[in-house]
Structure formats: C-alpha cells, structure tokens
Swiss-Prot record:
Chain's gene name: FEN1
Cofactor(s) listed: Mg(2+)
InterPro entries named in the record: 5-3_exonuclease_C_sf, Flap_endonuc, HhH2, PIN-like_dom_sf, XPG-I_dom, XPG/Rad2, XPG_CS, XPG_DNA_repair_N
Molecular functions (GO terms): 5'-3' exonuclease activity; 5'-flap endonuclease activity; DNA binding; magnesium ion binding
Protein name in UniProt: Flap endonuclease 1
Organism: Phaeosphaeria nodorum (strain SN15 / ATCC MYA-4574 / FGSC 10173)
C-alpha cells in the first residue's frame, strides 16, 4: 500500500523533486527492484475476460511472463537490475496483512458473482482485488532470475527497506518500487514505473529525497518526514479518521513530532480521535531502523552473469509452455547485452566530490539570502499595489 497521498504532497510542495524521463535515461545504472511489488503488478495485468495468463495445463504464468520480458527490456536499455524479495513481515504489519486477506476473500466472492451477473468492468475490477503473491510465485520467479543470470536477495523483512539500504550504501543508483514508503525508508532516489509495460507509455518517475525534504522544509537527520508519513497512513497502523494530506502536513509543522500531534489530538477530542491502539513510536522505529542486510555484507556483493539458455528453454518452454523461438531470441539478446554491459555511464567514472562544511554553509546562506530577497520584493509589490488602490481618482 505504501504511504497514502505522499506523492500528491510531493507534487504540491516539492515539484522539483520529481524528474520524468524515458527508460533509456537509466542506461548504465544498477537498480534495486522491489520484486514483490513487481510480481503483484504482473499478476494483476489481467486479460479483458478477467483471467490471468495461463499455460496449457492451467497454471498461472503472468508473473513469469512479466518478469522475463520486463527484465529483458531493462537490460536492453543498459540497466543492471537486481531484485529484492520480501522476507517475513514485521509484527506491526500483521494486522494490515490480515485486513488485506479479508478484503481479497470478499473480493473473490464478489468476482464470482460478477461473472454471473456483472459487466466486464465489474469482472476485471474484482479479479484484480483477489490477486495475491504466493510462495510458489516467488520461488518460480527466483528460479527464473537465476537462469537469466540476474542477481536477487531475500530481505530479512521489507523489500523496500532493503532496496533503500542498497541505494544509500552506494550498491545501486536507486530503489525501484511503486510503494512510496521506499522514501520513508530513506532511499536517496526512488524510481517509479520502471517495470511498467511499454504499451502503457508511462514515463519513468525519478524522485529525489533531498529535494522532497527541501520542499517540505524538513531536515534529513530528524524523523519529521517519517512522522508525516505515519500520519498520512502507512502499512503498520490504522489511519486517523479525518486527517488528509494537508491536515497531516499542518499538524507536523505546528507540533513538530508525533508526540506533539498526539498530545494536541488528546487535548481536544471533539475534532479528531486516535485509534484505540496506535503505537506510532514502534512504527517510527521500524522506519528508522528496519531489519535489513547491511549494504557491505557479503550477501550484497552482486554479480550479473551469462544466462543459462538451455535451462531457460527447459523451464519456460518445456514446463511452462512458452513459445520456444521467443524464449531463445530473448535469451540470446540477454547474453549479448550482458557482454556489452561493461560500458558504463559517466557517473561511474566521476564520483561527486563531497562539499566541505564551509561550502555547505555558504550555499545555505546564499539560498536564505535569495529567499529573503524574494519575500522582501513580494512585500514591496504588495505594498505598492495597496497604495495604488488607496489613491483617490482625479476627475478627467
């Protein structure tokens, strides 16, 4: 689910944080991809009759089809993908997962009814809601990635947190996920829409956390941004009814921390009421110190290798009944691209030099002066406008 309305807030307050571009702009970059989110998106790409892609024997193959061809597309555009799978969910998330399972059970019953009485739109809508990524889906995807020579890791808990750790540790350029809580886990750069199909013609969104914080007037070192995300609504806690994005931002700006916000709500319960059990400090700690594999651990020493073409044919063609020509052509292309992947973009050769504290202070001072000058000018313009209005008109 991620963080409710966070993207909307970023669009309003930090538009400079979002860059849009084509997939080819990511050439030469290593990217950590939230595998579970990607697999889910492949599974919900149902056909017009509400059914997923299946083999001749009735097995679902949407996840394998999506993973194989989207990965080929990324490698074809010079990207080095690595996939991160979810581990066990944190205890706080179990309540949210139970609710999701209940919603899917209800949606499954509604989908069956829609097939009998509903429109095509009803069938598709409810079919999407019943989709669940299973252990078997994950195992098959990991088997496919191994045969393709694409590295992967199973996170101790949340895939998004592990992706963020790898990006922060310099193992990859960015974390790729549709879940906005990847930013809450402190990834410097988040890529969205990277695993979308080419037919959707959606641009790749590149969101820079430092610019997000700048627009929201928050510091990276303080947990204000995390507190804002929890208040907006995250996977760990029930949302507070009546708090939308604008209210959440105002509350955090006025009261600085969730402790301050909670005290304010408890002092006047006529307007807002906290859920009965709302352990926000535990949720904050999960974002601040998630259970992850450190970026410098041996498990995070990733290698991209040549694909096992015959192994791919055996798995995808013989077992899953994919078209052999398409699989062989894709595997040959993958092999060729892996060989030429040594060519890297300039960022790999020229590491950015860290600014000195004096340079940082100078830049901040200049930015503050610029802002002060802008406010002064606006004030003078407003004053002149007011004076012009108050002047009596002379008779012509």
């Amino acid at each position: 689910m991620g963080i409710k309305h966070l993207y909307q807030l970023i669009q309003e307050h930090s538009p400079d944080a979002i860059k849009t571009g084509e997939i080819k702009n990511q050439f030469g970059r290593k990217v950590a991809i939230d595998a579970s989110m990607s697999i889910y998106s492949f599974l919900i790409a149902v056909r017009s009759d509400g059914q997923q892609l299946m083999s001749e024997t009735g097995e679902t193959t949407s996840h394998l089809m999506g993973l194989f061809y989207r990965t080929l597309r990324m490698v074809d555009n010079g990207i080095k993908p690595l996939y991160v799978f979810d581990g066990a969910p944190p205890k706080l998330k179990s309540g949210e997962l139970a609710k999701r399972f209940q919603r899917k059970s209800e949606a499954h019953a509604a989908a069956e009814e829609a097939k009998e009485t509903g429109t095509a739109e009803d069938v598709e809508k409810f079919s999407r809601r019943t989709v669940r990524v299973t252990r078997e889906h994950n195992e098959e995807c990991r088997r496919l990635l191994k045969l393709m020579g694409i590295p992967f890791i199973i996170a101790p808990t949340e895939a998004e947190a592990q992706c963020a750790t790898l990006a922060r540790g310099g193992k990859v350029y960015a974390a790729a996920s549709e879940d906005m809580d990847t930013l809450t886990f402190n990834t410097p750069i988040l890529l969205r829409h990277l695993t979308f199909s080419e037919q959707r013609k959606e641009p790749i969104l590149e969101i820079h956390l430092d610019k997000v914080l700048e627009g929201l007037e928050m510091e990276r070192e303080q947990p204000q941004f995390i507190d804002l995300c929890i208040l907006l609504g995250c996977d760990y806690l029930d949302p507070i009814k009546g708090i939308g994005p604008s209210t959440a931002l105002k509350l955090i700006r006025d009261h600085k921390t969730l402790e301050g916000v909670v005290a304010h709500i408890q002092s006047d319960q006529k307007k807002l009421t906290l859920p009965e059990d709302w352990p926000f400090a535990d949720a904050r700690q999960l974002f601040l110190e998630p259970d992850v594999c450190p970026a410098d651990a041996p498990e995070c020493d990733f290698k991209w290798e040549a694909p096992d073409i015959e192994g791919l044919v055996k798995f995808l063609v013989e077992e899953k009944h994919f078209n052999e020509d398409r699989v062989r052509n894709g595997a040959a292309k993958l092999q060729k691209n892996m060989k030429s992947a040594q060519q890297s973009r300039l960022e790999g050769f020229f590491k950015p030099v860290e600014r000195t504290p004096e340079e940082k202070a100078s830049l901040k001072r200049k930015a503050d002066e610029k802002l002060s000058e802008k406010k002064k000018k606006q004030k003078e313009e407003a004053k002149a406008k007011k004076q012009a209005k108050s002047k009596p008109r002379t008779a012509g």
